[in-house]
Amino acid sequence: MSAPAADHNAAKPIPHVPQASRRYKNSYNGFVYNIHTWLYDVSVFLFNILFTIFFREIKVRGAYNVPEVGVPTILVCAPHANQFIDPALVMSQTRLLKTSAGKSRSRMPCFVTAESSFKKRFISFFGHAMGGIPVPRIQDNLKPVDENLEIYAPDLKNHPEIIKGRSKNPQTTPVNFTKRFSAKSLLGLPDYLSNAQIKEIPDDETIILSSPFRTSKSKVVELLTNGTNFKYAEKIDNTETFQSVFDHLHTKGCVGIFPEGGSHDRPSLLPIKAGVAIMALGAVAADPTMKVAVVPCGLHYFHRNKFRSRAVLEYGEPIVVDGKYGEMYKDSPRETVSKLLKKITNSLFSVTENAPDYDTLMVIQAARRLYQPVKVRLPLPAIVEINRRLLFGYSKFKDDPRIIHLKKLVYDYNRKLDSVGLKDHQVMQLKTTKLEALRCFVTLIVRLIKFSVFAILSLPGSILFTPIFIICRVYSEKKAKEGLKKSLVKIKGTDLLATWKLIVALILAPILYVTYSILLIILARKQHYCRIWVPSNNAFIQFVYFYALLVFTTYSSLKTGEIGVDLFKSLRPLFVSIVYPGKKIEEIQTTRKNLSLELTAVCNDLGPLVFPDYDKLATEIFSKRDGYDVSSDAESSISRMSVQSRSRSSSIHSIGSLASNALSRVNSRGSLTDIPIFSDAKQGQWKSEGETSEDEDEFDEKNPAIVQTARSSDLNKENSRNTNISSKIASLVRQKREHEKKE
């Protein structure tokens, strides 16, 4: 346990208030530069190279919300959709803010990371280099119990929380639950089917669970009915982790955390646990003179698991936790944690997109494209903001007959496009007259020639990199299957694909290119004609020369191949214009026009009821038509409106309970021993998930070649209005969760 700090108002120490350590040396607070800081910067440099190659574009939004160096900060990040890429992206982009937002905002977040990740040698190296704070997770410690012991549910239908035990050989292996196990520990079924926490152990053969095993799978029902072997993990002590976080904050550092816990591929956030709130409250309770800024950070990926995709990183408005919160935490910890946790959850809604299921997400994205004027190109941050607002509007009016009707029409329209093989942004590009068809034919031939040229130019690098492409794909899919088997919340395991592609490429690429270089040196020494293009007979110089040449060839092929792929994507609408009957094309275009008009009318009617600045958004962004590039105007407009009246959009449908059951563990006599830091990641009421976006294709085809401590009173008023919007979301969340519980 952490050493208790003396309460200023009472002589008796308070267990849940940590010690404010003044002797802790923090190499990552921005005030010192040593070997640890240098390793951090080297890691950021490497990550930046990797992300420049893997992502086509990374946009950072709301950089002004990141507190300056010297302000204790917690970056609360969500959704955790790309395993190790997520924290690496946040760390690198936050450190690189010195180039866009000034050196004073260049922070070095140290992430709270699952202890199991530090057991992976490659991940452990970067984890230690970047000041990672390990946290044990109870589910990672599950181990098989004696095979002679079995558990079963005597009345699974009426009392699923009551678990009985029996022994195959009572003489040599007695059950003895009271001696073997303890409350707040974890039981697990075979093959990672389900886990459940122990509430109490009334006798040697009975266990009462805090919540029953999930019985959605028939295999679980079969095992609990007939009896099964099981796994067990002793309750964990998070005191050391909390103290490490407090030490970072007390020395004016920056801590990062994904409060959902492990990564997942669901379309909405997992429940947020109380640990993140206790980190901020414990720090200010120990030192009432300090203020902690809790900054929400949202990550948005367009095709997250694909090479050359796009990403948007968004920092939201900070929540300032001060000494007043600390005093409240000392007097009534549970209520204070609940209050702050709600604020943090609301703030995460403001920077993330949340849909109840995959179909709704696809409909919302299609609705945004239909609402957006055909030839207007919006920047990625604007697309993210509009998607978020549409999701929130849908959540509020989903039972409105007009919304139900529109959802069906949009869904049918998407199916029609799928049958033709078109994307929405390609529909209005289709031509119907004979003259236009002739022009399309000529354009098709020209683009085919260009595509062939770029394909040939990209061949050398593609051939060189083919072994890595193949191994990356095979190994990442293998890891995704393994992760899916172990996880209780993943759907397809797509959150693991990009991470393992990058890790495998990072390890294999240097090995492969060293091998290529050595082979070329041997070839140059044996073949005399090769000396024409080899600069020297020195083996080291030859190695450097060949290695650089191979890297340059691969990178050149990457860039030319990228243009070739964009050209290839633009061929389909030309082909459809030539081959498909004009009436069928006109029918699809008419359907789109009518659907766009109806959708716009409904948005214009309902939008102002949800967002006070709706008219301003529509006027400033969508009044620009006919090919006008509104990237700069729209981005600045969206940024201003994000500060003035953020939409706080969320799907509301599948977010976990705001008042986490972890709060019951916080009381005036409690400690930090078993407070959960990460979400339990229990499976909710989600239906399905996937991820597709036309925005990359649309951009590609059209282009083939703490807020400062002292804020003004006006901004305080705006923040108050933001809080009102967040409260509406919180209310909807609670209503939805209560409804799910009743079901």
UniProtKB/Swiss-Prot annotation:
The modification Phosphoserine is found at residues 632, 637, 647, 651, 654, 657, 664, 668, 671, 688, 693. InterPro entries: GPAT/DAPAT, Plipid/glycerol_acylTrfase. Its EC number is 2.3.1.15, 2.3.1.42. The modification Phosphothreonine is found at residues 673, 692. Residues 56-442, 474-501, 553-743 are cytoplasmic. GO terms for molecular function: glycerol-3-phosphate O-acyltransferase activity; glycerone-phosphate O-acyltransferase activity. The chain crosses the membrane at residues 35-55, 443-457, 459-473, 502-522, 532-552. It is found in: Lipid droplet; Endoplasmic reticulum membrane. The keyword Electron transport does not apply. This is Glycerol-3-phosphate O-acyltransferase 2. It comes from Saccharomyces cerevisiae (strain ATCC 204508 / S288c). The gene is GPT2.
